Structures are given as structure tokens and as C-alpha cells.
């Protein structure tokens, strides 16, 4: 029988019906989160797995980047900058300002309270950042860079390329940058981040009745990088805008001088785009556009759709006469004119010189012979009206060299803040100077202790009289300050002995005041006995002491184990520690120690997942650590909640055995909110007390599944092995040298 191919019209119809059916089915799908919205979400612990990386688990980005000819890459970027493309022509024939905005917006979502955001990972490629209102048309900037990425492939990540393109742009326009470091690996999926709870773009429901911005958020409105350039919620009040600027830039770790340098330096270049009303001209964002758009969004149907018809923020104009050159014109214009409110062609509020002054100063970005007045945003006027900002801008205007250096350093900080210590930096353009915000630690300057030394040091620790729980709590306090989001904290540096960490409530300051001097004495006495230039740091002693305590706890439970230990940590000094910068690392909740303060912005169980995410733990690792730390009596302030064992200080699987024991009946405590009591079902006798974090391992189906593995008769050995492996992982999270 002869078979015929379907006609194109029939094929199109079948495709249309299939797509419609698929969309209907997808729209009707009901997820678990709909039925049980309060159920604890464990998905943050399962993101960024190696299986999602197309380069494979063995891919070594540092090695790949090391093979890169960085000079050649920069030359190629420089060529792209001045090669205008018909599909998206360059303003003033130069893509430099466009790429600066791309790099800035890639890095500028960094926030200090949880370390999320920043350029690492290249998250600007993914939703929601890819489609944020503040990132309009940056999809085109990355497409302009695709030939560079295509050429060099796995040798340079998108995360590094976007920042490097910003640096090269500055240099090509006459600015001397402070340096550049590679080392940002790419993510392959969107990061799960709390960007706010608003349901509409540019909505603002993130301030309390006092006007305080909710933590850990860094922007004033949903979909903005920092603040509304027209003023808070679109109200053109420069002083109110200054307050928002100070708050949001402060949440990005910038002080007033750095903030001024960034705004004034960045707005020296380029222009804003608001040739038409976005509501009438601009189409769907990249995520909402059809497949035929191939990932590009905001299609503009007005005029050419680009060039002099470009619509981005809705604001329109340039700040300086020479938008592709490093000059002092931004500050000169800010103070040289009296500024009055005006409206862009799109109807957005901006500022222009009064009485028509400067009407013909600024050349059009695309139309030869056409000129305009310079413009300012409300947030620019804030740099003149706010007393502190005015002092800084006035000083910079009088001292161009100081302004240039301040902008160079602030730009470097902006684009490198989430990379962690300088030891993670790659490439030939890394500046030699160590900066305080990099949390510097002295370089290893001595031979490390060997196996025999380690054994002798363990004996000294055990003979010190410090209890097992005290050693475990101290080591955990030192190492668990690490944040995988911005690679800060950790045991290296022994900053636990310095302010502010030694005074954090979660770290039991009174206990530290007793334990640390004893460990310091052990360190000093031991170093006196060493030969051959060998030394051991207090940072190493703290970690080794924790491991030694765990070995002792395991022996008490009938196990002979060795907790892995790699020496080589160093001790930071007070001069290398910015107290205010480290203050934001203070845990307001650490569920692994059953610690929760009123300042925690997450409920206990969610705080557990958040802390585990920061420690880059998997669900089994998190589970093993909680169970082990409970039986080791490692709760903050020696609290007994969740210590489900009659032998605290022994490493056993008792936490899971007793949690899963059906002879215990649990109920809420009638006297203490947030606590639970476990009673013997037969006698009614009180057995245990617990927090929601303790009980979540029996109530949450997925966590219970893991708890059952460790609570089974054949799960004892597995638990001990898994606990030690997870403990060692946490102790080494900041060991970027191994």
C-alpha cells in the first residue's frame, strides 16, 4: 500500500493541536506545593548537581582558564566593542557602555545578608534575572558576546566573560581598571533565591511599617537591581532616593564613598533609553517570548525597534557630552547646572538643565548632527542633595585622580565581591594588593606537621581536660561560619578567636573564653617542641581538636575511626579582619546547633535547609550531621532539645533510633512556644524535648526516609561513616588549596 507524507497544512494543524493540548495539560497539573504549601522544601539542597553540568564531573575550570590567552581574548572583545551590528546597532558606535551595564547588573545583585547574587555562576543567563525589568535588552549584550564565547568555549565561563567584557569596555574608553580575576564557574540552572514575594514586577511589598527593607533582600522593588532611578516608588524625591541608595548599596557591601564612585563613574558612560512608551511598543520579556524569538525578548515595534528608537528603562538621554570616554563631565554637569524635573518621551521623570541650558551639548547616539541636553536621574541628583554624598562628589570633582582610583577599586569590588578569598583568583590581571574585604589570611610560611606530629597533638588535646562536646562545639563554630554563596567564613584564619565571632551568641562566648585559651596553650607548647621549621596554627588545632573529640566519642560507642585531617590553615590577624563586614555572617539561626534567635527571618525548619545550603550539603549529609551533633551534645548553650540518647558525648545512631521509636508520643509544650515534649506512651513519663528541627526528620516524608536508613539495625556503621565524611567536608569547605 502506498504511503503518503502529510501535507504541510495538516502537519501545522496537528502541531497546533498538540501544543494546545500540552499547554492545557500543563496548566491543569497540580503540584504537592499546592496541596501542602507549608511543606518543607528540600529542593535547594539538590540544585547544581554535577549531572546538570554538560562538561562533566571531571571538568577542571581553573585548568581550562589557565590555558587561555587572556590578551587575545581581550583583543577580541575590543574588536566586538566597535563592530556595530545591524540587528542591534551600538550607541555612538561603541558597545562599551552596554557591556558595562551587563557586567554591573550581573554582579550587582550580590547582597551581604545571605551572600547570594553576584557575578559567579552567570545567573543573568537564567530566569528570573534574564527577564527582570531592570535587565531589559541585556539579552542582546550577551548575544553580541556569543562569538567570543563560541571561540573559546570551555576555557572561559559566561560568568567570567561578562565581567571581563565590562573591564575591557572601561579600558577601551580610556579608564585604567584595578584588575581582573577569573575563576567564576558557570551554573547550569537557575539559582533558587528569595528575590521577594511580590506578584507583579516593580511592586514593593518588602518594607515594614517603619519603612525598613526586609532581609535578606537587596533591592527596593521587585525586578530592580538596586533602587528606582526616578525615586522611591517613582516619587522624584532626591533625599528619599539617597536613603534608598545608601540602604541598597550598603546591602551590597558598599560604603558611601564606594557608592558615589560607582554611580558617578558608571554614569560617565553611555545613555538611558526611553524613546517611546514601553507599554505601547515593547513586547514580551525573553522568558515569555515565543520559541521563534530564540531567547530574545522585549521586541520593539516602534520605529526601527533599536538605535534612536530603543526603549529600555523609559528614561532617555546621556549624562555627559562624551559618553564613550572617561571624563569628569558627569560631576561637572551635576554641579554646573541647575536641574529641574522633566519627562522623557516615554513619560518617565528625569531631570534636565533649567532654562534650556545645555540643550545642544550632547550628540545623538545614532543621528548625525542631532544634539540634546544632558540628563540626570533622581538618583543622580541625590548625590548632590544628600550631605554625605555631596561632600564626596565635591571632593572627587576637585581631585580627579582620587575619583578615578575610587571608581577603579569600587568596580573591582563590585565585580569580585562574591568570589571569596584571593586564593581563588585566576589569571594574569589579578592585582597584587590584598584588600580587607577579601578576608585575607596570611600565606602558609612554614612546614606543616606530619602524621607523627598529629598523633602527638591529639594526645595533648585529649589530656587537656576539655570535654568532647566542648571541642565539637568549638570546631563547628569555627568552620560552620562558611557560606558557599560568597565563599566567606570557615575555619581557616581562626577568626573564631577574634571579634566579632568570639562574641556571637550562637558560639557560646563564655565557653569559648574557657576553651580557646587552652587550645592556644596547646598550640604554643607544641610549636616549641617542633623541629625542622614545622608549625601548627590555632586554626588547625581547633579543627583537629574537633576531629579528635569525634574519634573519642566513636571509641566510647565501640567504633575505631579516624577523622581525616589536612594541616595547612593559617591564623588571620585583627588587622586583616573587618569587624563590620564579618558581622553579617553571624548566624541568627543554626539548626545544627538547635539555635534560633528572634532576629532569624526564617522559621526553624527552613533555617535548617538554608544553613545546609550555605554549607553545600546534600540531604543525607544534613541528616547525618544533625543526628551526630545531637548525640554529641553539641547544641548551642548546652541545650538538651533533640539530644535523644542516654549517653550524650558518644557517637551513635541513637538520635534516629529514639526519634523513630513508636513508644514515644509527641505533643506541643504547653509552656514554651516552639518546643515539643515526647512522653512514654505507657507510663506517660517525659522522655525528651525537641524543636521543630528535631522532629522534622520524623515528620517530613523525605527526611524520614533518610532517617530510617540511619535508624535501622544495619545503619549504625553507615551513620558513623557518613557523619564523619560530612563533618570533614564542613571542616574543609574553605580549603581552596586542597
Swiss-Prot record:
<keyword id="KW-0732">Signal</keyword>
<keyword id="KW-0560">Oxidoreductase</keyword>
<keyword id="KW-0479">Metal-binding</keyword>
<dbReference type="GO" id="GO:0046872">
    <property type="term" value="F:metal ion binding"/>
</dbReference>
<comment type="similarity">
    <text>Belongs to the peroxidase family. Peroxidase/catalase subfamily.</text>
</comment>
<feature type="cross-link" description="Tryptophyl-tyrosyl-methioninium (Trp-Tyr) (with M-252)">
    <location>
        <begin position="104"/>
        <end position="226"/>
    </location>
</feature>
<keyword id="KW-0349">Heme</keyword>
<feature type="signal peptide">
    <location>
        <begin position="1"/>
        <end position="26"/>
    </location>
</feature>
<dbReference type="InterPro" id="IPR002016">
    <property type="entry name" value="Haem_peroxidase"/>
</dbReference>
<dbReference type="GO" id="GO:0070301">
    <property type="term" value="P:cellular response to hydrogen peroxide"/>
</dbReference>
<feature type="active site" description="Proton acceptor">
    <location>
        <position position="105"/>
    </location>
</feature>
<protein>
    <recommendedName>
        <fullName>Catalase-peroxidase 2</fullName>
        <ecNumber>1.11.1.21</ecNumber>
    </recommendedName>
</protein>
<dbReference type="Pfam" id="PF00141">
    <property type="entry name" value="peroxidase"/>
</dbReference>
<comment type="function">
    <text>Bifunctional enzyme with both catalase and broad-spectrum peroxidase activity.</text>
</comment>
<dbReference type="InterPro" id="IPR010255">
    <property type="entry name" value="Haem_peroxidase_sf"/>
</dbReference>
<dbReference type="GO" id="GO:0004096">
    <property type="term" value="F:catalase activity"/>
</dbReference>
<dbReference type="InterPro" id="IPR019793">
    <property type="entry name" value="Peroxidases_heam-ligand_BS"/>
</dbReference>
<dbReference type="GO" id="GO:0042744">
    <property type="term" value="P:hydrogen peroxide catabolic process"/>
</dbReference>
<keyword id="KW-0408">Iron</keyword>
<dbReference type="GO" id="GO:0020037">
    <property type="term" value="F:heme binding"/>
</dbReference>
<feature type="cross-link" description="Tryptophyl-tyrosyl-methioninium (Tyr-Met) (with W-104)">
    <location>
        <begin position="226"/>
        <end position="252"/>
    </location>
</feature>
<feature type="site" description="Transition state stabilizer">
    <location>
        <position position="101"/>
    </location>
</feature>
<comment type="subunit">
    <text>Homodimer or homotetramer.</text>
</comment>
<feature type="binding site" description="axial binding residue">
    <location>
        <position position="267"/>
    </location>
    <ligand>
        <name>heme b</name>
    </ligand>
</feature>
<dbReference type="InterPro" id="IPR000763">
    <property type="entry name" value="Catalase_peroxidase"/>
</dbReference>
<dbReference type="InterPro" id="IPR019794">
    <property type="entry name" value="Peroxidases_AS"/>
</dbReference>
<dbReference type="GO" id="GO:0005829">
    <property type="term" value="C:cytosol"/>
</dbReference>
<keyword id="KW-0575">Peroxidase</keyword>
<keyword id="KW-0376">Hydrogen peroxide</keyword>
Amino acid at each position: 500500500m502506498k504511503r503518503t507524507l502529510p501535507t504541510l497544512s495538516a502537519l501545522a494543524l496537528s502541531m497546533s493541536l498538540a501544543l494546545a493540548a500540552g499547554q492545557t495539560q500543563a496548566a491543569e497539573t497540580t503540584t504537592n506545593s499546592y496541596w501542602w504549601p507549608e511543606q518543607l522544601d528540600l529542593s535547594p539542597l539538590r540544585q547544581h548537581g554535577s549531572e546538570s553540568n554538560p562538561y562533566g564531573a571531571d571538568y577542571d575550570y581553573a585548568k581550562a582558564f589557565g590555558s587561555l590567552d587572556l590578551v587575545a581574548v581581550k583583543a577580541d572583545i575590543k574588536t566586538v566593542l566597535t563592530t556595530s551590528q545591524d540587528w542591534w546597532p551600538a550607541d555612538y558606535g561603541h558597545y562599551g557602555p552596554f557591556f558595562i551595564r551587563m557586567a554591573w547588573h550581573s554582579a550587582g545583585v550580590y547582597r551581604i545578608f545571605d551572600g547570594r547574587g553576584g557575578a559567579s555562576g552567570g545567573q543573568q543567563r537564567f530566569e528570573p534575572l534574564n527577564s527582570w525589568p531592570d535587565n531589559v535588552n541585556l539579552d542582546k549584550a550577551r548575544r553580541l558576546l556569543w562569538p567570543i564565547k563560541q571561540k573559546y568555549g570551555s576555557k572561559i565561563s559566561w560568568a567570567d566573560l561578562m565581567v571581563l567584557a565590562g573591564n575591557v569596555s572601561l579600558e577601551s574608553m580610556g579608564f585604567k581598571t584595578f584588575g581582573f580575576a577569573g575563576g567564576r564557574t558557570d551554573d547550569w540552572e537557575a539559582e533558587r533565591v528569595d528575590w521577594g514575594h511580590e506578584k507583579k514586577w516593580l511592586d514593593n511589598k518588602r518594607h515594614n511599617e517603619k519603612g525598613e527593607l526586609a532581609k535578606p533582600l537587596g533591592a527596593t522593588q521587585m525586578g530592580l537591581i538596586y533602587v528606582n532611578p526616578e525615586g522611591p516608588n517613582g516619587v522624584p524625591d532626591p533625599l528619599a532616593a539617597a536613603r534608598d541608595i545608601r540602604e541598597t548599596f550598603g546591602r551590597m557591601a558598599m560604603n558611601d564613598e564606594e557608592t558615589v564612585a560607582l554611580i558617578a563613574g558608571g554614569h560617565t558612560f553611555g545613555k538611558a533609553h526611553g524613546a517611546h512608551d514601553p507599554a505601547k511598543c515593547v513586547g514580551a520579556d525573553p522568558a515569555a517570548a515565543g520559541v521563534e524569538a530564540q531567547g530574545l525578548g522585549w521586541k520593539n515595534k516602534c520605529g526601527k525597534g533599536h538605535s534612536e528608537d530603543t526603549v529600555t528603562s523609559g528614561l532617555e538621554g546621556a549624562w555627559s557630552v562624551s559618553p564613550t570616554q572617561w571624563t569628569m563631565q558627569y560631576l561637572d554637569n551635576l554641579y554646573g547646572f541647575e536641574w529641574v524635573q522633566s519627562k522623557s518621551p516615554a513619560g518617565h521623570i528625569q531631570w534636565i538643565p533649567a532654562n534650556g541650558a545645555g540643550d545642544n551639548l550632547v550628540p545623538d547616539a545614532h543621528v548625525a548632527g542631532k544634539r540634546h541636553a544632558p540628563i540626570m536621574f533622581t538618583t543622580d541628583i541625590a548625590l548632590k542633595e544628600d550631605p554625605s554624598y555631596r561632600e564626596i562628589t565635591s571632593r572627587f570633582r576637585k581631585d580627579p585622580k582620587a575619583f578615578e582610583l575610587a571608581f577603579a577599586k569600587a568596580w573591582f569590588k563590585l565585580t569580585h565581591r562574591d568570589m571569596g578569598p584571593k586564593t581563588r583568583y585566576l589569571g594574569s590581571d589579578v592585582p597584587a594588593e590584598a584588600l580587607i574585604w577579601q578576608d585575607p589570611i596570611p600565606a602558609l610560611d612554614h612546614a606543616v606537621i606530619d602524621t607523627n606530629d598529629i598523633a602527638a597533638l591529639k594526645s595533648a588535646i585529649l589530656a587537656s581536660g576539655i570535654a568532647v562536646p566542648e571541642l565539637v562545639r568549638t570546631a563547628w563554630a569555627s568552620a560552620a561560619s562558611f557560606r558557599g554563596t560568597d565563599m566567606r567564613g570557615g575555619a581557616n584564619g581562626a577568626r573564631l578567636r577574634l571579634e566579632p565571632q568570639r562574641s556571637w551568641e550562637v558560639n557560646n562566648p563564655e565557653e569559648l573564653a574557657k576553651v580557646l585559651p587552652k587550645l592556644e596553650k596547646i598550640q604554643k607548647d607544641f610549636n616549641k617542641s617542633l623541629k625542622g621549621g614545622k608549625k601548627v596554627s590555632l586554626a588547625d588545632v581547633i579543627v583537629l581538636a574537633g576531629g579528635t573529640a569525634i574519634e573519642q566519642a566513636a571509641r566510647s560507642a565501640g567504633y575505631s575511626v579516624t577523622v581525616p585531617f589536612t594541616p595547612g590553615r593559617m591564623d588571620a590577624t585583627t588587622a586583616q579582619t573587618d569587624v563590620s563586614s564579618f558581622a553579617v555572617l553571624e548566624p541568627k539561626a543554626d539548626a545544627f546547633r538547635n539555635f534560633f534567635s528572634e532576629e532569624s527571618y526564617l522559621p526553624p525548619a527552613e533555617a535548617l535547609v538554608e544553613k545546609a545550603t550555605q554549607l553545600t550539603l546534600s540531604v543525607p549529609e544534613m541528616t547525618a550531621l544533625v543526628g551526630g551533633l545531637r548525640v554529641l551534645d553539641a547544641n548551642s548553650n548546652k541545650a538538651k532539645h533533640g539530644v535523644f540518647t542516654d549517653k550524650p558525648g558518644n557517637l551513635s545512631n541513637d538520635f534516629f533510633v529514639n526519634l523513630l521509636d513508636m513508644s514515644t508520643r509527641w505533643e506541643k509544650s504547653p509552656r514554651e512556644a516552639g518546643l515539643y515534649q515526647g512522653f512514654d506512651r505507657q507510663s506517660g513519663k517525659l522522655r525528651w524535648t525537641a524543636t521543630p528541627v528535631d522532629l522534622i526528620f520524623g515528620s517530613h516524608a523525605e527526611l524520614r526516609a533518610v532517617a530510617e536508613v540511619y535508624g535501622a539495625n544495619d545503619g549504625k556503621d553507615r551513620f558513623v561513616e557518613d557523619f564523619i565524611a560530612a563533618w570533614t567536608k564542613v571542616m574543609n569547605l574553605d580549603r581552596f588549596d586542597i
